[in-house]
Amino acid sequence: MIQELGVMLFKEREKMGEKQKRVADGIISISEMSKVESGGHEIDYFTLQALFERLGKSIDKLELAVSGEEYAAISYRAEIEHSIAEWDHERLTELIAGYDTYNDNKRSIHKQYKAALWAMACYMKKQDHASCLCGMEQALACTLRNDWRRALGAGQRLCNQEIRLIMVIAYCLWELGDISGLSGHLEQLCSYILHHYTDTEEQVKVYPHCAW
């Protein structure tokens, strides 16, 4: 099924007139993207999800039949997010330490997620916005080569994970009083979500974070 989704990704990208580079950049190489889109190469669930999200599409509604390992990885992330919602620093750090057991730590999307989790764990313990900002910016750089403000202006495609990181970064900047041009950049981000996240399922994932 994962391989079939690669072909679907190709068809969707072609229909939208998007180049491979704009979708794959920072997540996987162009050569690997070609193999995925031909159905001849499998990548993990979260990496594939990020590629679809950069097209504004959701793989959730496809009711994807995942393997036992992929289900365990998805469940593990859900447990991580629950620990954050419960503000349980000790549990979160335990879960971060075990993250690589379920995911490929060489993939940029997982490096980014893990880096963001460490930044969040640090914030939960110290409530230090400057440290959190630094950590989140480093996490975002795992997939975005340019500063996020410049990326928005250049029409960079973004996955859900990148959008959430940008929102946390914006929040930290606001708390630190560094608000020059911030509202304009956030308006650009909101406009991007409205125009490029065409699947309602993906919009629903992002809107609660926007409200927060």
Tell where the protein language model's regions lie, with residue ranges:
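"A position-specific structural signal for the A-helix of alpha-solenoid helical repeats
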Residues: 8, 74, 78-81, 110-121, ...
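Residue signature of alpha-solenoid helical repeat architecture, marking inter-repeat boundaries
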Residues: 70, 108-111, 153-162, 201-205
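Short coil/turn connectors between adjacent alpha-helices in alpha-solenoid helical repeat scaffolds
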Residues: 80-89, 120-135, 169-183
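A short, Lys/Arg-rich alpha-helix, primarily the initiator
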Residues: 1-15
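Short alpha-helical DNA-recognition segment
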Residues: 16-35
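DNA major-groove recognition helix of helix-turn-helix/homeodomain DNA-binding modules
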Residues: 46-62
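Alpha-helical segment of the N-proximal tetratricopeptide repeat
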Residues: 75-102
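Amphipathic alpha-helical segments of tetratricopeptide repeats
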Residues: 93-104, 137-150, 184-198
